[in-house]
Structure formats: structure tokens, C-alpha cells
Design a protein with these regions (language model features):
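Structural signature of transmembrane alpha-helix termini at the membrane-water interface
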Residues: 18, 45-53, 57, 87, ...
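Non-cytosolic membrane-interface motifs at loop->transmembrane helix junctions
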Residues: 2-3, 64-69, 127-136, 189-200
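Specific transmembrane alpha-helix
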Residues: 8-23, 78-93, 122-157, 200-212
């Protein structure tokens, strides 16, 4: 179950790339972030209020300060990540659409993004082989994957659903077994390969959204 559920954030990032890869910089676009900020503040205060009712909330001044450092709600890291990605999207789209007529240009972008963020969790399993400095940039990689799925959706639709489902179930089985053995007789081991930037999560995300 965890192997599937951890794809929720990556799926949202891929969907963002799928839907927003044509957005351009404008005042209207920048102002589009305001509803996100308002929702974040409202939800953070709501969470603080509920925790306060059960005696687990901080004082009000700490809650207000926590809004600015994303600590009032424990899941605020996601909003912190998305705000930055949202502001970057017009620039990412310039990269995506700059030389799209060049053969394999988009494939190169996705490959480099995957090489820097996802592959280190696989290739560095038994020792550092490739740089892993850029793993934290996984939101950008998922965004470009979404843009790729949008741009080449007609070609992707030609892949039979049977092959995709088989691949998904096979990957799910293998990853579940490897994670189970890695955590045998101890608490679940949250490691690079099963993190948001891990190759397991990336593979499950791509196969899952391709099926959808």
C-alpha cells in the first residue's frame, strides 16, 4: 500500500506538467498563486485550531510565526515546494518549448532530469557512482515527465493497456518484496530508492499515470 500511496505527490507534479506546460509568464499567471497562499493560511489555522481543541496546539503567536516557516501544519512542506515550482513553471516551459523541433530534444530533457534526480537512488545503491546533488530537484523532473506525457500522448496511447498493467503489477510486486526484506524485523526503512526521488517511486508514478 505504501508503495502505491507514496506516488500521490509525484502524480500531482506529473499532472501539473501535463496541464501547465503551455503556460506563459503574465501578471494574471503570477496572481494565480494568491488562492494557493490563502488556502494554505486558512488550512494551517484550521489545523492549529483543531489541535488546540484537543490540547496539542501551540500558542497563537507561535502558530502565526509557523505560517511563515511552514511549521504550523506538518504537511506544509508540500505547499512550500509547490509555491516555488509554480513560480518556476513559465521558465520551465521556455526550456520545454525552446527547441522542440529538434529530434529527441524533449527526450534529452527528461533523460537528464531523471539521471540527476532518480537514477542516483539506483546506481548508487552499493556506492556512489554518479552525482546525487540534484536529487532534491525531483519536482522539476516530475514536471517535465508530465510535459512529455502531454506532448507525446498519442504515441503513448499506442502502448497496450495490458502491457502497462503488467508492468505496473510487476514493479509493485518487486518493489514491495525488496522493501519488505530491507525492513525485515525492524521499522520501515525510508531509503533513497523508495523516497519521492527514488527510482521505485518514479517508475510506479509513470506507469500509474500512463494507465490512467
Amino acid at each position: 500500500i505504501r508503495t502505491i500511496l507514496i506516488t500521490c505527490v509525484p502524480l500531482f507534479l506529473v499532472a501539473t506538467g501535463f496541464l501547465m506546460n503551455r503556460k506563459e509568464l503574465s501578471a494574471q499567471y503570477v496572481l494565480g498563486i494568491v488562492p494557493v497562499i490563502i488556502s494554505y493560511i486558512g488550512i494551517s489555522l484550521l489545523v492549529w485550531g483543531v489541535l488546540s481543541l484537543v490540547g496539542k496546539g501551540s500558542d497563537f503567536s507561535t502558530a502565526i510565526n509557523g505560517i511563515f516557516d511552514y511549521s504550523t501544519d506538518s504537511y506544509s512542506w508540500y505547499v512550500e515546494m509547490y509555491l516555488g515550482l509554480y513560480l518556476f513553471i513559465p521558465l520551465l516551459n521556455i526550456i520545454w518549448n525552446y527547441k522542440k523541433e529538434i529530434k529527441n530534444y524533449h527526450l534529452y530533457i527528461v533523460f537528464i532530469a531523471s539521471l540527476l534526480t532518480f537514477l542516483p537512488s539506483l546506481l548508487n545503491s552499493f556506492g556512489k557512482v554518479i552525482p546525487d546533488y540534484w536529487q532534491i530537484c525531483y519536482p522539476v523532473s516530475y514536471y517535465f515527465i508530465g510535459a512529455y506525457l502531454y506532448t507525446y500522448q498519442n504515441e503513448i496511447k499506442k502502448i497496450s493497456i495490458g502491457k502497462l498493467v503488467t508492468g505496473f503489477l510487476s514493479a509493485l510486486t518487486i518493489f514491495t518484496l525488496t522493501d519488505t526484506f530491507a525492513s525485515w524485523n525492524q521499522e520501515f526503512q525510508w531509503l533513497d530508492h523508495n523516497d519521492y526521488f527514488g527510482y521505485q517511486t518514479a517508475i510506479m508514478t509513470v506507469l500509474g499515470i500512463a494507465i490512467l
